[in-house]
């Protein structure tokens, strides 16, 4: 009888320890997930910024990477990648460097085509067309081969200008992950075609699939805040060995000393 009571007590003690450990782990995970969501929400508040000139007066997270007096530079990037079955992968997008010190913006529009060389190895053929921005207008700074490309560049809109995440907290069944070794973190959501941002992308791009995309929000760097690291959005419509269709976007605030670009 005494042995039975000791055994029962021992089992209860083990179960209690398991419950306590489980509760601690769950609490820690929930706290970290909330911190990840809060970190992303700070970035998503920038959407939409319809007038890119507004970035001259916006300040992001500053740390010791910034020199005294440096107001920083915003880097905005949007690109659409389409690889239909049996065809080459083509990427079209634009990058702008919005310098808050000089209140000037330069960058480039790019068209990249992934093909195979004579040995069957992947080859990335990218062409860049330098641009500047004045009064929220994109202006090519070098002659272009045709008017179609000129209109494409002048009419280009970054996702940050029309994307809107006011309903982000209503997204259901998000898959949140965290890797402390990098550190990196992400949140993934399955969207529907009636989602506002999905409709905006379909309005602006000829997306050759009716599949609704998954939204992946990913970042790296210190969760508490750091100018070293990045946060990116990715809308993946199709992803497999034969076909890839996805859109990526990023808005990054960094020290002006760390920014450089090349155009050809």
UniProtKB/Swiss-Prot annotation:
It is a single-pass membrane protein. GO terms for cellular component: plasma membrane. It is found in: Cell membrane. Keywords: Cell membrane, Membrane, Transmembrane, Transmembrane helix. The chain crosses the membrane at residues 7-27. It comes from the Bacteria. Its main location: membrane. InterPro entries: Csa, Csa_sf. Gene3D superfamilies: 2.50.20.40. NCBIfam families: SA_tandem_lipo. Belongs to the staphylococcal tandem lipoprotein family. This is Uncharacterized protein SA2269.
